[in-house]
Amino acid sequence: GTGGGKTTTFMIPNIEYALACGTSFISTDSKGDLLRLYGKLCEQYGYTCLNINFRTPMKSDSYNYMQLINLYIDMWRDDPKRVDYHSRAERYAKALANSIVHTKGFDGGGQNSYFYDSSEGLITSIILLVAQYCKPEERHIVSVFKILLEFVQTVKSANDETDSQRKVKQTKLNEILSLLPEDDKIRWFAGSVPGSEGMQYLSVITTSMSRLLAFIDSESENILCKNSKITVADIYQKKVAVFITFPEEDATKHVLVSLFLSQIINEAIVYADERTKENKLTRRLYIFADEFGIFPYMGNILGMFGASRSRNIIIVPCIQSPAQLRQTYGADGETIIRDCCQTVIFGGFSPMSDTAVTFSKLLGNQTVAAGSVSTNNREGRSLFGSGSNSSRSVNMIARPLMTPDELQLLPFGKWVVNRRGSHPFIANMPRYDKWGIRLEAPYISETREYVPTAYAKLDDVIRTIKERKWRQTVREKRESANPSESVDSTADY
């Protein structure tokens, strides 16, 4: 519960342990206490400290949510035969678009589900378009919004010049997709949107733009539009501490946190499967997800919980109530997440909380002796006279191991630990200073200099596509004329 002491009795000692062991970790924090207390100590331990601060963006390091997509697109262009690189970029683009559309409170769209499904495909398409055809400094999520904004405009098709009676308007989206090869996945992800007309077309575009509004913030662009000083692979190979600070009162920033965690966990699983001998990270990765219950829906999070532990990735979700998971992921999703948790630590319940009843049932029952004493009096005799007759019976009954009242009365620093394969017990987890942990001067983040953001322009994208298409045509003609001539294999598309 709120004020139960998660940070001072659990998070800080565990981060201290992670630093001593040399393991990388990621922590989320709504107040910024963990960064303030442990920033300097991380540097003393030889860690690279990444500060993602959505509460004070001008004091934050940068992290481009398209960084992984851009990376795999570049790797594919350098080696076009590695189709798996392009496939991975497509997968991350789809995951990013899915998380953007399925933000907290999304109920599937109801009767408007067509527009939301189309928006998801369109956002995926534009993400790949920006990653593949924009300049390096323009490849970020805000450029996706700007491209969509330009798509609202229309252009006249060439048919207008020959048939003045039949005015056919071609959208900017249709114009740019028509320049791409027929089998280009950018065209496929867009689906039926390019062929839509009038209000239907505008509805899909505006729906897509509305889901991207969380990224439109002049201060947050300082984070979202620049590449990070570390790569995702650094987190698994080196000693890296990532502190994510977010305002719990601003729901638009919650989706940014969930997107970050989703990308890191997904890439960690792929890295463990493809680049390690035993299919698990050689350096353990801890993810301390404080306030996990208020984060929006994270795509494939149920699969991540099931697959992460065997890859040496330990996810530690901290929630206020299981009802938070039920609200975001449904009853089945809540059950799956709970079943994947091998160790459960709970305590600090509010006096008005019904959650104590749930965890009391989780602990199970114990067998105790219960009895009764009855006294029968003969007529005319006193209660304690020789005529009294008393009987005593003892029965064995089931009693909760800890009743809800007993759970609510647990003092500060006392937590119930229920671990797989062992009996539950009450652990004494005092405040961190009682452990002998001494924290020195607080870590103070410096204010970063504002750097203007470069945005993609649709005309530049069209020009780039035409130039690459022309180079591809020239190359094909040269190959057909001189089949034995060696040709650069760099992909133009």
Question: What is the meaning of each model-derived region?
Answer:
Residues 1-313, 328, 339, 405-426, ...:
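P-loop NTPase motor domains
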Residues 305-416:
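Conserved ATP-driven motor cores of ASCE-family P-loop NTPases powering translocation/secretion/packaging/pilus
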